[in-house]
Structure formats: C-alpha cells, structure tokens
Amino acid sequence: MSHSITVLKSKLHNAKVTHALKDYEGSVALSPELIKLGKFSMHEQVHLWNITQGTRLITYIMEYDGDEKGTICVNGAAAHRANPGDRVILATFAEIDSEKADNWEPHIVIMNEDNTQKK
C-alpha cells in the first residue's frame, strides 16, 4: 500500500554564514547562485542546522539583494542562533510516494570555505 513520506530534497552541507541581522524580517537570505546551486525555491521552508553551535531552526528562503556572491544572511529571531562564520547545513524536504523512496536521490552539495561547491 502506497502512502506519502517526507524525504530530503536538497541540501548545502558545511556552508558558512556570512551575515546575521537581528533587526530584519525573519528568514535566511541566499545569494542567487546559492539558491540555484541548492535547487531551492523562493519562500521554500528550509531547515538550518548550525554545526558550530549545535542548534536547529526552521525558516524560509529569500533572495539576498546585495551583490556579494556566496552570501548566507540569517535574519530576524533566527539571527540569535547563527553568527557570521558559523558552519551550517541548509536542508529542504519533499513529499513523495513511498513506492518511489528506494530510488529517490536527494541533491547534496558539499561546500568550500568560501561557499562555493567542492569539486
């Protein structure tokens, strides 16, 4: 019998927070190339797991409006849980039919220190 299950859709692993703005509308703002690299969508729910601090939170993705590449800007209340330089995992999930789970392949990108993809 088939049913829906939640699976890892995509993640950026070992990325680095570049900014944390407490006095800002909540979310995590990513530079456009990171949104594309992670196969994320605007306003998509994202889990932010802070490797440095050992904390986890859930927020949503928005596009960073500056010119800097490799930007991960944690905003609002979430900025109390992430500091510039912290290593993080950004993960999104999807609902799929359980019969497809064994063949599911999440999109996983391991990051360099400068928030580019490791080769």
State what each model feature region is.
Residues S10, V28, V109:
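Residues that recognize and position ribonucleotide moieties
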Residues L12, H43, E105:
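Short coil/loop residues immediately preceding or within conserved phosphate-binding loops
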Residues D102:
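Flexible, glycine/charged-enriched surface loops at secondary-structure junctions
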Residues S2-L8, H13:
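A cross-kingdom feature strongest in bacterial/archaeal respiratory oxidoreductases
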Residues V7, K16-T18, K22-E99, D114:
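Compact, glycine-rich, soluble single-domain proteins
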